[in-house]
Amino acid sequence: MNKPIEERELILAILLEVTRDKVPGHLALSRVLSKYQYLDKRERAFITRVTEGTLEHMIEIDYIIDQFSKTKTAKMKPVIRIILRSAVYQLKYMDQVPASAVCNEAVRLAKKRGFQNLSGFVNGVLRTIARQMDQVKLPEHPLSRRLSVQYSIPEWMVETWLSSYPEETVEKMLSFMMEEHPTCIRFDPERITKEEIKARLKEDGVEKVEDHPVLP
């Protein structure tokens, strides 16, 4: 029997599909979660969060990596670039994952994928970032570059908005886009009750389930 594939290997595979093969993120993620049915809820949640978070914050993540690496992300081998990106996302946005574990797993994955010669590079970059993350400063100029990095939105898009709206309005738009919005579920009351849906969602690990403020 083959050894079950590990979470970070799946994350790497998904992100390579998205960034290298141009497969839509939601489709690549869905395929993996459907294929590996043996994954438990915690593993599926971890894969989903790291995958979606890395994609959502990729511009910011690349900026952070480029502050500490002599080899810029654009010049890196795709596998190493993805390993660093997903690790930096965890370092910055997932406090519950120890920095040492993030670094060690990234090094292990680099070696497993045949990049033994770059494992020291991965280790050095990530441990430096882990120590100095709070020292990373956003670019001051031009404004479009700062907003692009801060909100991980392509700079050309920011420039387009700045040419049409005041700076304050653009910042509000970008901030709103980065907010986490609730997921709404519509159900057929003839087939299932609201209480049954709430119970099932909580069984599946959804921590907070609330009624819609307007709809019944």
Question: What spans do the regions from the language model cover?
Answer:
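Class I Rossmann-like S-adenosyl-L-methionine
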Residues: 1-216
